[in-house]
Amino acid sequence: MLKQSERRRSWSYRPWNTTENEGSQHRRSICSLGARSGSQASIHGWTEGNYNYYIEEDEDGEEEDQWKDDLAEEDQQAGEVTTAKPEGPSDPPALLSTLNVNVGGHSYQLDYCELAGFPKTRLGRLATSTSRSRQLSLCDDYEEQTDEYFFDRDPAVFQLVYNFYLSGVLLVLDGLCPRRFLEELGYWGVRLKYTPRCCRICFEERRDELSERLKIQHELRAQAQVEEAEELFRDMRFYGPQRRRLWNLMEKPFSSVAAKAIGVASSTFVLVSVVALALNTVEEMQQHSGQGEGGPDLRPILEHVEMLCMGFFTLEYLLRLASTPDLRRFARSALNLVDLVAILPLYLQLLLECFTGEGHQRGQTVGSVGKVGQVLRVMRLMRIFRILKLARHSTGLRAFGFTLRQCYQQVGCLLLFIAMGIFTFSAAVYSVEHDVPSTNFTTIPHSWWWAAVSISTVGYGDMYPETHLGRFFAFLCIAFGIILNGMPISILYNKFSDYYSKLKAYEYTTIRRERGEVNFMQRARKKIAECLLGSNPQLTPRQEN
């Protein structure tokens, strides 16, 4: 808020006399607007700059009825006031032709006839109101000696509002904040319904762009830092402080040395499990671990390594689940869903293997066992999703996922165009190639693979048209793929670069704040000094430093 003028006084109620009411009914129709002389600031001219007209559809109906009810109430109160004979001299009618306002230290004189033309605005209601209490409720302060109304608002925006009362057109300065400008317009009650709507486009574009940037900034901050509710940990009935320390240990890797060690161990186990999953398919690496007391162990060594990794992932997930302050937020988190998908296939596979073993003992049909085997292969395939656990420790992966969420419309359009191209060109090539002897374009579904490879500009060469018309369609398909791949990639890359840099900056700020409590370099120097002091106790304090 701007400071009010030093000449402001406390509110003082003064009843209006009959002369004032009569003078208000015979106001001059001239619209004399000008600045007051003396210590007050003069009226500024229209500010130079880039302006845009702004329109907002007038909301009739409830607002119109409310305005009529207010006027009826004010007329009734005015009739009660005029019944009493006022005391003291009356003001000249000439002084009642203008309304004196002071906005942020700048004084203005507005003609009553201009304000009465916009009775729904704040100054219009102030000018047309006959109740002093109603007038005082519309302003911040009132000075009786100079008959001046004070408002603690932005004078730069009111200059545009003042020009609106003068010309009937609101000019929007491009340098103003859209949200701040709309807030000021809401306070003054300016509706602006007589300006062409086409001039509103520039202002709406800036407003929408600002809203989108603020939304993205909020989501990026939420991605960069773990939102924890202090009151939730404080109000927990069961082991609140212990769960808070465990939460910091699992979710904030830079809050302590132990948390950093757990983060490094988690990334290491992810890489080891992925390597073990890949090497487990190599026949030379499938060596048995030996024989135990219960008989030969048929599981390879790499499967034992994978089981160890899955045990760590399970323990990590359970600790996060036990320490979370909000189960709903935990369930909605994408990273926690990835953790669950990473460990769930192994337990489903073990469960199905148990049922499969019982089925063999009971002599079930081969068909049912074969179906279970297919399900087991799908479960094994789902284990590759555990590599997505690296997104918890990788800024680039999280920025890539955030980019896909923000650009889902562009990605959807890209997939739609690719599908349309595949269906169109595969049907076209099939129509001219299916009669060729020993052709690979036997059906349209068989042609989909060729169209997909051609649109992606890969070109394996396993399928190719032989007729001249088919080659012409192939050229069109490749050209369509080049144009299609070039349009959205630049947009996605620019947004990914922007989101990655912002997310990296927010993460750096969060890490610096978390490291404020734990200074690893200072702790390392302290440990080295303690070791040196233990090996040579004759060191002086100066030598220790």
Swiss-Prot record:
Membrane topology of this protein: Multi-pass membrane protein
Protein name: Potassium voltage-gated channel subfamily V member 2
Gene responsible for this protein: KCNV2
GO MF entry, a single one: potassium channel regulator activity
Keyword line: Cell membrane, Cone-rod dystrophy, Disease variant, Glycoprotein, Ion channel, Ion transport, Membrane, Potassium, Potassium channel, Potassium transport, Transmembrane, Transmembrane helix, Transport, Voltage-gated channel
GO cellular component terms given for this protein: membrane; plasma membrane; voltage-gated potassium channel complex
Record field: transmembrane: 156-176, 262-282, 337-357, 375-395, 411-431, 472-492
Organism for this UniProt entry: Homo sapiens (Human)
Subunit and partners: Heteromultimer with KCNB1, KCNC1 and KCNF1. Does not form homomultimers.
GO biological process: action potential; potassium ion transmembrane transport; protein homooligomerization
Main location: membrane
Region (Disordered) location: 74-93
